[in-house]
Amino acid sequence: MPKLEMMLLVLLILPLSSFSAAGEQVVQGDQRSDGLARYLQRGGRDVQECQVVTPGSKWGRCCLNRVCGPMCCPASHCYCIYHRGRGHGCSC
């Protein structure tokens, strides 16, 4: 099969949405890979202050941080950790 015919066949098989306007191939991931991309792009949000939800609570609501998601530790000397089998928590 000549190269031109092969190229036309490939273009017919591939959906047009898999290419950008510049002709570059665009990778369209599933929901899991999209979530990973958002996770990797949100590094600057980790520096926002935590808002304490209720006095005495060990958790506050804040920006999405890499370890604890939408939750964070309300005291500045605490940090988020992951306990195997128990989930996320604060270590002070």
Curated annotation (Swiss-Prot):
Key words, A-Z: Acetylcholine receptor inhibiting toxin, Disulfide bond, Gamma-carboxyglutamic acid, Hydroxylation, Ion channel impairing toxin, Neurotoxin, Postsynaptic neurotoxin, Secreted, Signal, Toxin
Tissue: Expressed by the venom duct.
Location(s) in or outside the cell: Secreted
Signal peptide feature range: 1-24
4-carboxyglutamate modification, residue list: 49
Keyword Metal-binding: no
Modified residues (4-hydroxyproline): 55
Propeptide stretches in the record: 25-45
Disulfide bonds listed in the record: 63-72, 68-80, 73-90, 78-92
The keyword Methyltransferase appears for this protein: no
Entry comment, domain topic: The cysteine framework is XX (C-CC-C-CC-C-C-C-C).
Protein purpose: Alpha-conotoxins act on postsynaptic membranes, they bind to the nicotinic acetylcholine receptors (nAChR) and thus inhibit them. Through its two C-terminal domains, this homodimeric protein would bind to two nAChR allosteric sites, located outside the nAChR C-loop of the principal binding face and at the adjacent binding interface in a clockwise direction. This toxin specifically blocks mammalian neuronal nAChR of the alpha-7/CHRNA7, alpha-3-beta-2/CHRNA3-CHRNB2 and alpha-4-beta-2/CHRNA4-CHRNB2 subtypes.
Subunit structure: Hetero-, homo- or pseudo-homodimer (identical sequence, different post-translational modifications).
Similarity field: Belongs to the conotoxin D superfamily.
Protein's name in the database: Alpha-conotoxin-like Mi20.2
